[in-house]
């Protein structure tokens, strides 16, 4: 499964580079893994250059066994699709330690007859699968149905994923992908230690935030040449952790963003660099929700045929004109004090001299520990 982690990490930073262009100074939050798994679902039915483009952009071409025939993909358990399914099952199963809900589905205009093997395959491997709806004569009704499904799958958190103008009678197929996350820390922050303090948005501007605090032993690294620190905070599930990448300077985010990559993050978080130390941690409470037009994002990254009349999705439907008319991604994350074990901050070791104070813009990600797959990636410029 490790190779999926590498693909999701590489894809993560490709997406980040593209999003940065249009969201230079905004908060950002998205799930590389969720987008990747949805594209894997499309990839199963894509042919020719449509398939080649997805392959290249999502780095599927680097994963052994990914391009096998549709029968093999559904019939064998030792391939990448079932590995993706295994990670999806692991992270979305009911769990007291976190809630991680994923809504991912294709909605096709009902006049496109769907290949039965494809339907069976995506149902088996990707729970959302494909639904047929009537965009042609009841587009607004179809939109309401899609929005209601996403809302129910994310426990009421992500609403109105499709805006009124996003579908019409010409819509052929829509891809929706949404993720909502709330985690319990392995070591809780005590609510009474949370204080209102200024978060320095820029050198000139600050805003009051709820800053959580605890002293504990965590994996940290100080990177002098990159002028930043990294902290890893485990979630109670034992399967996920959060990495916080904090520039030394208030205005240091731009420099960090210009050098960060799959290779760099792998190097910085390696066991030879990160070490467990006692540290005073200051982290703001966060509640973030962002929505992105995947159509323009993926087209800018090189997946162009899928959204045009050049699309070849004959593995999904034999009707030649099928393409994706609209693709949307939404992500929501809530980070607060809640955790499994409460460590008394005062007595937890007054000897901690090292400080990790996230009181200015930083990057963060939630990763699946076993595979290194990036489940969420975010930029916090204003909590």
UniProtKB/Swiss-Prot annotation:
<feature type="site" description="Reactive bond homolog">
    <location>
        <begin position="353"/>
        <end position="354"/>
    </location>
</feature>
<feature type="glycosylation site" description="N-linked (GlcNAc...) asparagine">
    <location>
        <position position="293"/>
    </location>
</feature>
<keyword id="KW-0325">Glycoprotein</keyword>
<keyword id="KW-0007">Acetylation</keyword>
<dbReference type="InterPro" id="IPR000215">
    <property type="entry name" value="Serpin_fam"/>
</dbReference>
<feature type="modified residue" description="Phosphoserine">
    <location>
        <position position="69"/>
    </location>
</feature>
<dbReference type="InterPro" id="IPR036186">
    <property type="entry name" value="Serpin_sf"/>
</dbReference>
<dbReference type="InterPro" id="IPR042185">
    <property type="entry name" value="Serpin_sf_2"/>
</dbReference>
<comment type="function">
    <text>Storage protein of egg white. Lack protease inhibitory activity.</text>
</comment>
<keyword id="KW-1015">Disulfide bond</keyword>
<keyword id="KW-0597">Phosphoprotein</keyword>
<comment type="similarity">
    <text>Belongs to the serpin family. Ov-serpin subfamily.</text>
</comment>
<dbReference type="Pfam" id="PF00079">
    <property type="entry name" value="Serpin"/>
</dbReference>
<dbReference type="InterPro" id="IPR023795">
    <property type="entry name" value="Serpin_CS"/>
</dbReference>
<feature type="modified residue" description="Phosphoserine">
    <location>
        <position position="345"/>
    </location>
</feature>
<protein>
    <recommendedName>
        <fullName>Ovalbumin</fullName>
    </recommendedName>
</protein>
<keyword id="KW-0732">Signal</keyword>
<dbReference type="InterPro" id="IPR042178">
    <property type="entry name" value="Serpin_sf_1"/>
</dbReference>
<feature type="signal peptide" description="Not cleaved">
    <location>
        <begin position="22"/>
        <end position="48"/>
    </location>
</feature>
<dbReference type="GO" id="GO:0005615">
    <property type="term" value="C:extracellular space"/>
</dbReference>
<keyword id="KW-0964">Secreted</keyword>
<feature type="modified residue" description="N-acetylglycine">
    <location>
        <position position="2"/>
    </location>
</feature>
<feature type="disulfide bond">
    <location>
        <begin position="74"/>
        <end position="121"/>
    </location>
</feature>
<dbReference type="GO" id="GO:0004867">
    <property type="term" value="F:serine-type endopeptidase inhibitor activity"/>
</dbReference>
<feature type="glycosylation site" description="N-linked (GlcNAc...) asparagine">
    <location>
        <position position="312"/>
    </location>
</feature>
<dbReference type="InterPro" id="IPR023796">
    <property type="entry name" value="Serpin_dom"/>
</dbReference>
């Amino acid at each position: 499964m490790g190779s999926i982690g590498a693909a999701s990490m590489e894809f993560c930073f490709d997406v980040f580079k593209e999003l940065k262009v249009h969201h230079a100074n905004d908060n950002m939050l998205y799930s590389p893994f969720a987008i990747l798994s949805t594209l894997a679902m499309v990839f199963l039915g894509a042919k020719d250059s449509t398939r080649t483009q997805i392959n290249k952009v999502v780095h599927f071409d680097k994963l052994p066994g990914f391009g096998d025939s549709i029968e093999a993909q559904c019939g064998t358990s030792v391939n990448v699709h079932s590995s993706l399914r295994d990670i999806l099952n692991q992270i979305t199963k009911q769990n007291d330690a976190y809630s991680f809900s994923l809504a991912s589905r294709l909605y096709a205009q009902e006049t496109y007859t769907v290949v039965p093997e494809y339907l069976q395959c995506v149902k088996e491997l990707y729970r959302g699968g494909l639904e047929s709806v009537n965009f042609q004569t009841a587009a607004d009704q179809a939109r309401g149905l899609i929005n209601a499904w996403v809302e129910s799958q994310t426990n009421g958190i992500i609403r109105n994923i499709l805006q009124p103008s996003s579908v019409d009678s010409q819509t052929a197929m829509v891809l929706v992908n949404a993720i909502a996350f709330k985690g319990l820390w392995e070591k809780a922050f005590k609510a009474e230690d949370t204080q209102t303090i200024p978060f320095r948005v820029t050198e000139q501007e600050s805003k009051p935030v709820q800053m959580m605090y605890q002293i504990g032993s965590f994996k940290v690294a100080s990177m002098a040449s990159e002028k930043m620190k990294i902290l890893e905070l485990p979630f109670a599930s034992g399967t996920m952790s959060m990495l916080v990448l904090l520039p030394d300077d208030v205005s240091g985010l731009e420099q960090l963003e210009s050098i960060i990559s799959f290779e760099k993050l792998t190097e910085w978080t390696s066991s030879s660099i990160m070490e467990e130390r006692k540290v005073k941690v200051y982290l703001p409470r966060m509640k973030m929700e962002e929505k992105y037009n995947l159509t323009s994002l993926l087209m800018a990254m090189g997946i162009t045929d899928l959204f045009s009349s050049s699309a070849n999705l004959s593995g999904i439907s034999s009707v030649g004109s099928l393409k994706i008319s609209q693709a949307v991604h939404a992500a929501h994350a809530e980070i607060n004090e809640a955790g499994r074990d409460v460590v008394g901050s005062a007595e937890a070791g007054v000897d901690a001299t090292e400080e990790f104070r996230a009181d200015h813009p930083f990057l963060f990600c939630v990763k699946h520990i076993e595979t290194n797959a990036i489940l969420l990636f975010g930029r916090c410029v204003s909590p």
